[in-house]
Amino acid sequence: MDDDSLQKEFVHRVLEAYRKTPGTMGTIRRPDRLLAQQLYQRGVSATTVENAFVRAAARRLMRSTDAPPLGTIRSLAYFLPVIDEVLGLSVSQDYFQHLRQKLQRFPSTR
Protein backbone atom coordinates (compact mmCIF):
# COMPACT_ATOMS: atom_id res chain seq x y z
CA MET A 1 0.00 0.00 0.00
CA ASP A 2 1.37 3.45 -0.87
CA ASP A 3 1.75 6.24 1.68
CA ASP A 4 -1.30 8.14 0.39
CA SER A 5 -3.49 5.10 0.94
CA LEU A 6 -2.00 4.50 4.38
CA GLN A 7 -2.63 8.12 5.36
CA LYS A 8 -6.23 8.00 4.12
CA GLU A 9 -6.83 4.78 6.07
CA PHE A 10 -5.27 6.32 9.21
CA VAL A 11 -7.33 9.52 8.91
CA HIS A 12 -10.54 7.55 8.36
CA ARG A 13 -9.85 5.28 11.35
CA VAL A 14 -8.97 8.17 13.68
CA LEU A 15 -11.90 10.34 12.64
CA GLU A 16 -14.36 7.47 12.92
CA ALA A 17 -13.09 6.70 16.43
CA TYR A 18 -13.28 10.41 17.32
CA ARG A 19 -16.84 10.63 16.03
CA LYS A 20 -17.87 7.70 18.23
CA THR A 21 -16.08 8.88 21.38
CA PRO A 22 -18.47 9.72 24.23
CA GLY A 23 -18.64 13.44 24.91
CA THR A 24 -17.88 14.56 21.35
CA MET A 25 -20.33 16.25 18.99
CA GLY A 26 -20.16 13.25 16.69
CA THR A 27 -19.36 15.42 13.69
CA ILE A 28 -16.11 15.91 11.82
CA ARG A 29 -14.91 19.29 10.63
CA ARG A 30 -12.12 20.25 8.28
CA PRO A 31 -9.70 21.22 11.11
CA ASP A 32 -10.22 17.74 12.59
CA ARG A 33 -9.31 16.12 9.28
CA LEU A 34 -6.20 18.33 8.96
CA LEU A 35 -5.12 17.49 12.50
CA ALA A 36 -5.55 13.76 11.82
CA GLN A 37 -3.27 14.16 8.80
CA GLN A 38 -0.70 15.96 10.96
CA LEU A 39 -0.82 13.15 13.52
CA TYR A 40 -0.11 10.67 10.74
CA GLN A 41 2.81 12.80 9.53
CA ARG A 42 4.16 12.93 13.10
CA GLY A 43 4.18 9.13 13.14
CA VAL A 44 1.57 8.77 15.88
CA SER A 45 -0.16 5.40 15.60
CA ALA A 46 -3.93 5.14 15.25
CA THR A 47 -3.93 2.88 18.30
CA THR A 48 -2.27 5.62 20.36
CA VAL A 49 -4.91 8.14 19.27
CA GLU A 50 -7.73 5.70 20.02
CA ASN A 51 -6.23 4.99 23.44
CA ALA A 52 -6.15 8.74 24.12
CA PHE A 53 -9.85 8.96 23.23
CA VAL A 54 -10.60 6.15 25.67
CA ARG A 55 -8.49 7.67 28.44
CA ALA A 56 -10.05 11.12 28.07
CA ALA A 57 -13.60 9.77 27.81
CA ALA A 58 -13.08 7.63 30.92
CA ARG A 59 -11.84 10.65 32.88
CA ARG A 60 -14.83 12.71 31.81
CA LEU A 61 -17.43 10.03 32.50
CA MET A 62 -16.02 8.69 35.76
CA ARG A 63 -16.07 12.01 37.57
CA SER A 64 -17.91 12.61 40.80
CA THR A 65 -21.66 12.94 40.40
CA ASP A 66 -21.36 16.21 42.35
CA ALA A 67 -19.03 17.73 39.75
CA PRO A 68 -20.53 20.28 37.37
CA PRO A 69 -21.33 18.94 33.90
CA LEU A 70 -18.69 19.28 31.21
CA GLY A 71 -19.36 20.79 27.81
CA THR A 72 -19.35 18.83 24.59
CA ILE A 73 -15.98 18.22 22.93
CA ARG A 74 -16.04 20.12 19.64
CA SER A 75 -12.58 19.48 18.23
CA LEU A 76 -10.07 16.70 17.80
CA ALA A 77 -7.52 19.20 19.15
CA TYR A 78 -9.04 18.72 22.61
CA PHE A 79 -7.29 15.35 22.71
CA LEU A 80 -3.76 16.55 21.82
CA PRO A 81 -2.53 16.74 25.44
CA VAL A 82 -3.94 13.28 26.12
CA ILE A 83 -2.32 11.88 22.96
CA ASP A 84 1.03 13.25 24.18
CA GLU A 85 0.32 11.78 27.60
CA VAL A 86 -0.43 8.34 26.12
CA LEU A 87 2.78 8.52 24.08
CA GLY A 88 4.70 8.88 27.34
CA LEU A 89 2.95 6.04 29.17
CA SER A 90 4.46 2.62 29.60
CA VAL A 91 1.35 0.57 30.32
CA SER A 92 -0.02 -2.57 28.76
CA GLN A 93 -2.84 -2.54 26.22
CA ASP A 94 -4.79 -4.37 28.94
CA TYR A 95 -5.10 -1.02 30.75
CA PHE A 96 -6.89 0.54 27.79
CA GLN A 97 -9.02 -2.56 27.33
CA HIS A 98 -10.05 -2.23 30.99
CA LEU A 99 -11.03 1.41 30.39
CA ARG A 100 -13.01 0.40 27.27
CA GLN A 101 -14.95 -2.14 29.33
CA LYS A 102 -15.69 0.48 31.99
CA LEU A 103 -16.91 2.92 29.33
CA GLN A 104 -19.33 0.32 27.96
CA ARG A 105 -21.16 0.41 31.30
CA PHE A 106 -22.03 4.08 30.87
CA PRO A 107 -25.07 5.11 28.87
CA SER A 108 -24.34 6.94 25.64
CA THR A 109 -23.90 10.67 26.14
CA ARG A 110 -25.06 11.46 22.63
Which ranges hold each PLM region?
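Intrinsically disordered, low-complexity, basic-enriched segments
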Residues: 2-110
